[in-house]
């Protein structure tokens, strides 16, 4: 079997730990029964012997396969990793979702996406990345009593993601340590109102209002202070056609949304200014992970 798992961008400004969306940038995993277990990694992480020895995908896959079948079996697993590590593009969620969905498939169970999502929350407690990795689209999600409740809005082909990917990683754990334990009433109300407004803008396709809707007062600027160039990324993006410019997850990548006809000009402007960073254009994914038989 083969599985494709999309990259994701979470928070989207004010939707801290609640909002996310899916990009057409995929990791793929091919799994087949084998006489002996083997692992091959291509792309991101291919030069890491530690990743092969301490592979989170394998750990989760084997745990769930054993839970479902009561036995261990040998598999040949080939990873094609395209999602950058520790750049705020959901590489960890792709691993978790991919491992769970693959384990159910190889064990002979046709798990619904709801089952996969609720299993994934055990390993990743924030639903804003795992939900779009499962369902695709723009997602608003909450967790209640261990269950994930997620609503999806399909994203239009009229808009594109222009993603700035710095060469400096930022781990979610260290990025969270920057944040305060308490927030003011003003900060909380700002993010509640803007997250609600942002969701309605995507639903109504009012992309012209995304810049207003995506204002955050809780986490972005605090996190961006670890990589000062990100403030300039946002400035250049808005000067060159971006509808919305937000930190992707905990960073260090920056998500810029533009009309498809403006995306190339925006990419060129960002590349010209930030030559050391990758700047890529992606379509939005509305499907989430997909399994096919090889």
UniProtKB/Swiss-Prot annotation:
Gene3D superfamilies: 3.30.230.10, GHMP kinase, C-terminal domain
Pathway participation: Amino-acid biosynthesis; L-threonine biosynthesis; L-threonine from L-aspartate: step 4/5
Main location: cytoplasm
Name under which the protein is recorded: Homoserine kinase
Enzyme class: transferase
Entry keyword annotation includes Nucleotide-binding: yes
This protein's UniProt keywords: Amino-acid biosynthesis, ATP-binding, Cytoplasm, Kinase, Nucleotide-binding, Threonine biosynthesis, Transferase
Organism: Campylobacter concisus (strain 13826)
């Amino acid at each position: 079997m083969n599985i494709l798992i999309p990259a994701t961008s979470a928070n989207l400004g004010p939707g801290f730990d609640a909002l996310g969306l899916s990009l057409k940038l995929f990791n793929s995993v091919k799994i087949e029964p084998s006489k002996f277990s083997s692992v091959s990694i291509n792309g991101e992480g291919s030069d890491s012997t530690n990743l092969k020895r301490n592979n989170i995908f394998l750990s989760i896959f084997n745990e769930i396969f054993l839970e479902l079948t009561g036995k261990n079996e040998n598999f040949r697993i080939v990873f094609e990793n395209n999602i950058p590590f520790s750049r705020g593009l959901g590489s960890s969620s792709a691993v978790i979702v991919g491992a769970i969905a693959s384990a159910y498939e190889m064990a002979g169970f046709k798990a619904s996406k709801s089952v996969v999502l609720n299993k994934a929350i055990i390993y990743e407690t924030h639903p804003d990345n795992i939900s779009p990795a499962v369902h695709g689209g723009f997602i608003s999600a909450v967790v209640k009593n261990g269950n994930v409740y997620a609503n999806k809005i399909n994203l239009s082909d009229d808009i594109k993601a222009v993603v700035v990917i710095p060469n400096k990683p930022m781990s979610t754990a260290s990025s969270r340590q920057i944040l305060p334990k308490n927030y003011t009433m003003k900060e909380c109300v700002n993010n509640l109102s803007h997250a609600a407004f942002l969701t309605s803008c995507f639903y109504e396709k009012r992309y012209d209002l995304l810049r207003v809707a995506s204002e955050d007062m809780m986490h972005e600027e605090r996190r961006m202070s670890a990589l000062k160039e990100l403030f300039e990324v946002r400035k250049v993006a808005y000067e060159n056609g971006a509808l919305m410019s937000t930190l992707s997850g905990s960073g260090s990548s920056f998500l810029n949304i533009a009309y498809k006809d403006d995306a190339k000009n925006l990419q060129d402007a960002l590349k010209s200014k930030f030559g050391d960073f990758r700047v890529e254009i992606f379509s939005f994914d509305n499907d989430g992970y997909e399994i096919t038989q090889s």
